[in-house]
Each structure stands twice: as C-alpha cells, then as structure tokens.
Regions:
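Beta-loop motif signature
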Residues: 25-42, 59, 90-155, 185-225, ...
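SH3/SH3-like beta-barrel superfamily modules
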Residues: 47-70, 81, 136-170, 210-244
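Edge beta-strand at a domain terminus
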Residues: 79, 83, 169, 244-255, ...
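Sec-dependent signal peptide cleavage junction
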Residues: 16-26
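Bacterial N-terminal signal peptides
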Residues: 9-15
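Boundary regions of SH3-family modules and the immediately adjacent low-complexity/disordered segments
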Residues: 36, 66-108, 157-186, 229-257
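Tryptophan-anchored aromatic micro-motifs
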Residues: 26-39, 256-276, 320-322, 367
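N-terminal glycine/threonine-rich, aromatic-flanked beta-hairpin/loop signature
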Residues: 104, 270-332, 343, 357-361
Length: 371
C-alpha cells in the first residue's frame, strides 16, 4: 500500500510531460499533463491494468482496447488510487454500474453563502440519521456548495474542519437551482463496504455495509463513488456515498423474456436508440446491420426485411441480456460490446401490439419485427 501511494506522489511531482508517454508503467504510477486547460491524468497503472487517456475519444483505454467509462480525463485532485479497478473483471463491473446509473443526472456545484446556521441530515427526511451525535449543522457564513435539490431539501458540501468535509441535506430549497434526476438500482454490498458522507478527504465511515439493508444506488458521484440510500439496523434512513468497487448489481437474467424478443427488429418511430435494424439471437449474441441512406429514409426494411444492401457490420456485433427491470420497468435490456468492455442499459417493454420499446432517461424508441 505504501509503495503505491509513494509511487503516485512521485509521479505527481514530476514536471508535466516529463515522462515518456509510451514508457511502461509500474503498479501505482501515473502520468500527469495538461488536458483542456487543467492538470489531469493521462496514464494510470493499477494492478494488471495500464490505462491511457485518448483525447480523440475522451476515454481511458488499455493497449488492447478495453475502455474504462469516465466523464473525460480525471482532474488532478480527483484521482483515488485505492478505489481504482485493478483487474479486467473489476473494470467491467465499473462499466456495468456506470451504465445502470445513466437514468440519473450529474451533481451540480454552485457556491452558496448566507448567515443561517442550518441542521444537516443524512437524507432528505427529518427522521433520518444526523451526524455529530444528532447535532450536525452548517453555517452558511463559512461557505458551502450546493450539489442538488430534492423536493424542498438541498444537498450541500461543507468543511467540518481542515481534514474533514461533509455532504448532507438541509431543509430548504432557497439556496439556488440544482434540479436532478435520481435512479433506483437495488444492489448488494461486498465485504468491507461502507457508506460515508465525505468521499473526498476522510472517508469517515457513517455506517459499515454489513449493518445496512435495502441498499439502492441513486446516482454516480464520480468515477469512484456512487450515491446511495439504505436503511440502518434501527430502521433509520441513511443516504451516503459507497465505493463503486464495493457494489454488486443484483441482475438476474430472464430467459423467457429473451426468448420472447429473439428475432430481427427494425426501427419504426421515436428515438433511434438501438440502431436501425438488428437481430437478437437466442444465445445472447446480436448484430446490427449497415443499411443504405435510401433504406433509412423509406424504412422499406419494415416490409421487405433484410436485403442485399443491408450487411451485418463487423463492428456491430454485441452481446445482450434481459434482466429484472429498474425504475418501475418490468425489464432492462443490457447491450455489451465484447471488444471494448463497454455496455449500454435500456429499460425494455414488449407492447401488447407487438412493438419492442427501449427507454432511457426521457428518450424512447420503438421497433417492430421484420420478415
């Protein structure tokens, strides 16, 4: 552990661009350079993974093309080496959680000031857990950052002391405008998991994972943390941050639902989320077809089916599953790219009139079976 931290600090102290970009890295080392006007990590070695930032695609990837899904280059201050994926399996797990949380919007960051001293709760509920022996509060005179609003509550980040931050809820919606969309993903916590109200500095354990029930992910905070809600042993509600690496999705494949939608489908209306024409095979393999502009405009594939000018795309091969649904849907559809390790998750529904619908956030598209 000390060796990894020392290697990180040593790399951080190097002059920007001092290391050779293609030079092999050892576990725990990084390269730092300027990206879009800020210091960011351009290469990270973690366990068996060496991830290099590609400005053209705005992603991190291994030499053989495995992508780690993040929102662009990691700024210098956000990297948390102890929470990095260290194996291919862990990276794929992070990508799956990233896809599962796409219904949720990001956090805001708006500075707020004032004169009030406000009680701070761990959830937007007067009966939820309250830190500091039930006395946690924030003085707006000292400054705070508004992260989101939920009903008539506001989530704020503030400094407790020089080595401790806290993120919690205050019962007011007058601090600014920070609307968000939250999701609701049931998960299981792995051994050693914990929830914290300080994901940036102290990682103070508000609760240990094995003391929590009904854990559900609400949003992704950054590449290393998810925002979650849970219930404590005494029934108290608790919201906080959990490391992505300590979360396991509770997905169960629905073989009957997969059998019901196997076949070839063509786009017929709404948002074109899944490509124009694709085939879902019963073994979980799938393929998208490259079709001509004329076929796109006329949608003749809906009556003629696959014709000579509609060829399977080698880059359009994918794996697919149907699992239990989230956010009120009966089923979710997971599309996985086996070549780069990324995946996309949609809510899915087979309508009474035979259309297959895919939905994500506020977008949706419909497909019909084709000959």
């Amino acid at each position: 552990m000390k060796k990894r931290i020392f290697a990180l600090l040593l790399a951080a102290m190097l002059p920007l661009g001092a290391a050779i970009a293609d030079e092999p890295l050892t576990d725990g080392t990084v390269l730092v350079d300027w990206v879009d006007g800020q210091e960011a990590y351009t290469a990270i070695c973690s366990g068996e993974l060496t991830l290099r930032y590609d400005a053209d695609t705005n992603t991190y990837a291994t030499a053989d093309g495995l992508i780690w899904k993040t929102e662009g280059a990691l700024p210098f201050a956000t990297y948390q080496p102890l929470l990095m994926p260290r194996t291919r399996e862990e990276l794929l797990q992070c990508n799956a959680i990233y896809a599962a949380l796409q219904d949720a919007s990001g956090f805001w960051s708006e500075k707020v000031t004032g004169t009030e001293v406000l009680p701070v709760c761990a959830a937007p509920d007067e009966n939820s857990y309250r830190a500091s022996n039930g006395k946690a509060s924030v003085s707006l005179a000292g400054g705070a950052t508004l992260l989101m609003q939920y009903g008539d509550w506001s989530l704020v980040r503030y400094e407790v002391n020089s080595s401790r931050m806290r993120i919690g809820w205050v019962h007011t919606n007058q601090l600014g405008s920070a609307p968000v969309m939250l999701t609701d993903i049931p998960v299981t916590l792995k051994d050693g998991a914990f929830l914290t109200d300080d994901p940036a500095t102290s990682w103070y354990h508000t609760a240990e994972g094995d003391t929590l029930t009904d854990v559900r992910l609400l949003a992704q905070y950054d590449p290393f943390w998810a925002y979650a809600r849970a219930t404590m042993q005494d029934g108290t509600i608790l919201w906080g941050f959990v490391p992505l690496m300590s979360v396991q999705l509770n997905d169960t494949v629905d073989a009957e639902a997969m059998a019901n939608v196997s076949g070839t489908w063509g786009f017929c209306g709404g948002g074109e989320l899944m490509g124009w024409v694709f085939t879902l095979m019963a073994d979980g393999q799938g393929v998208c077809y490259a079709i001509s502009d004329e076929a796109l405009e006329s949608m003749r594939y809906l009556t003629e089916g696959i014709t000579a000018d509609m060829n399977p795309e080698s880059a359009g091969m994918f794996q697919w599953q149907i699992v239990g649904g989230t956010n009120g849907y009966a089923h979710d559809f997971i599309l996985s790219n086996t070549s780069n390790g990324t995946c996309v998750r949609y809510h899915a529904a087979l309508t009474e009139d035979g259309y297959l619908g895919f939905y994500q956030c506020e977008a949706g598209g419909h497909y019909q079976r084709i000959p």
